[in-house]
């Protein structure tokens, strides 16, 4: 079974949103034209260390602290910086097991999609939920203590989510790469 299928049309199969082709290239080029080399360096530094002092950030990008602060405020206001958060150690906090789950819904109607999305939002074990094109509807990233906890989660939460017809579970054996940093030019 192929993991990736080509979209049926712009906007995607099964109601998946998004643009394919030239529009995404235009958006990327527009973003790059609005950000200069210093903006990109600021974003790169902040991705690596969100707690860097304004003074050290200014030294890293060779601008005054006042100019850097103004740029960071503009990048935040313009939506390039969404926020700052601490990266926690899941092993030390009883969430050492990561499991990816493919979810196939019984119907693909707007009501089912909305009910599923609303139910997923309130579950802390579900860290990420992505609507995808292909042989299933959603891909979930979950974390919990161990397989016994996942088994309980599957029976009491996952299979009770609105519209779920079928799931496939992929326990992670090793996290080879785990980053939130975007590759900036």
Region roles according to the model:
Residues 1-185:
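A compositional/biophysical signature of low hydrophobicity enriched in polar/charged and small residues
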